[in-house]
Structure formats: C-alpha cells, structure tokens
C-alpha cells in the first residue's frame, strides 16, 4: 500500500504496477538524474542484494551460499563491463574481514603484541550506531577512548569543555598526540561553562590546535561533533547534543 506524501524511490516493476492504478493528478514522477544514476541505482540494489542474501539464509543456506550469490553478482558485473579488474573483487571463500593492520616497523611488534591486540570500539566503524544510554550499550566515554587511540587525526567541535569530562579521556588524547596524531579543537566560552584547567591541559599536548570563541553575544554554539580520521578510510564521526 502506498501512503500519500513525499518519495524519492526507484520505480521497480512492483511499484510500477501500483502506480498504473493511480490517476496522473495524484502522482508525480521524474527521470533519474543521469549524473546521480550510479549512486541512486547502487543504493537501490544494496537493498535488493541484502534481501536476497537474507532469503538465502532464511532458506537454510550458510555463509558459503551467500558468498556464492555475492560472487555471482560480481561475475555478472565483470561480464557486462568487460573489465578484468572486477574479478579481484570477488569475496574470498574463507568469509573473513580485515580488522586491523600494523606497520612493518611498529614498535608494538617488538613487545610481543600483534594486530589482534589493538583497541577498537565495540560499535562498528563501518555501520551507523545510535547511543541511547541503555544499560546494555557501551559507555560513550569508553568508546571515545578506543576511537582516540585508533585514529590518525581528530577534530572536535564542542560548545564547552569541562575538566570533569575531559579527564576521562585525557590519557588517551595525550598518548595520541605524543604518538604524532594531529588534534584540532574548536570550542566556546558559552555560558562560562568551559574550564580553564581543561584548556590548559589540552594546550600542553603536542600536535594540538585549539580555537576558543569568546564572543558570547553572537555565538550560540550547542553542537557536539567528534571526527576520528583513519588513513584506512574507516573514519568515524559522533554527533550529538551532549558532551
């Protein structure tokens, strides 16, 4: 059943049959933008592929069967485009994910540690997550600690900085900065809430830039954003309304 309202949905065969029963005055359609077609169709197909893989699983197929279907799709793309490079994009039969990689000269290797020992957030760095403060969820500050030590660069935009909050992650920030990581922070003196001690502690860190706005008349910043850049491409961002 189609509900009245706004859409931005690719018209597939099923939807087309429903639309055929609706008078022209009640519907509005438009061609897919040629410049955006690849993105629009890829997003649509992501849904279709996921449903297909879930169907394989629901019918008793293991991950091997799902990989087989995924590779059939890759093969179809390769055959259609005649680009041999697509052959390298087939999923390996071992059904594994790369989780971490260390440099060849990483000092941790000399201490007996391996890539498996690296701290990583409990939440996915590839999928979106929502923090609600529920008991079964990881605590926000513990996730930030793991994000910090696994990042290459960090940007923070916060309306104010309290020492009571900063002290929970200052050790990780210090370790990050001393290891060559670049830290950039923008904050304000909003409502006089920023603690001088917090700013002084951050100023003492190497590779750190801090910008503080003292314009209390025009600045009404109440956004909180933390961006953890990773050279691997798996950058994560936290956006919310609380420090």
Indicate residue ranges for each PLM-predicted region.
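PLD/PLD-like phosphodiesterase catalytic module centered on the HKD motif
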Residues: 1-243
């Amino acid at each position: 059943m189609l509900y009245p309202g706004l859409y931005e949905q690719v018209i597939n065969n099923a939807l087309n049959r429903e639309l055929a029963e609706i008078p022209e005055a009640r519907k509005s359609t438009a061609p897919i933008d040629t410049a955006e077609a690849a993105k629009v169709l890829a997003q649509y197909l992501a849904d279709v592929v996921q449903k297909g893989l879930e169907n394989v699983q629901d019918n008793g197929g293991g991950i091997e069967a799902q990989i087989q279907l995924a590779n059939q799709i890759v093969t179809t793309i390769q055959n259609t485009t005649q680009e041999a490079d697509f052959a390298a994009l087939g999923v390996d039969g071992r059904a594994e994910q790369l989780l971490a990689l260390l440099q060849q000269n990483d000092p941790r290797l000399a201490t007996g540690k391996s890539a498996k020992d690296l701290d990583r957030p409990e939440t996915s760095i590839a999928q979106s997550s929502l923090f609600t403060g529920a008991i079964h969820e990881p605590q926000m500050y513990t996730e930030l600690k793991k994000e910090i030590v696994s990042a290459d660069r960090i940007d923070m935009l916060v309306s104010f900085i309290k020492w009571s909050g900063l002290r929970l992650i200052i050790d990780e920030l210090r370790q990050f900065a001393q290891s060559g990581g670049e830290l950039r922070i923008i904050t304000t003196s909003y409502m006089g809430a920023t603690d001088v001690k917090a700013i002084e502690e951050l100023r003492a860190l190497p590779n750190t830039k801090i910008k503080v706005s003292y314009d209390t008349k025009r600045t009404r910043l109440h956004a909180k954003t933390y961006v953890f850049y990773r050279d691997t491409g798996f950058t994560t961002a936290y956006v919310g309304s609380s420090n």
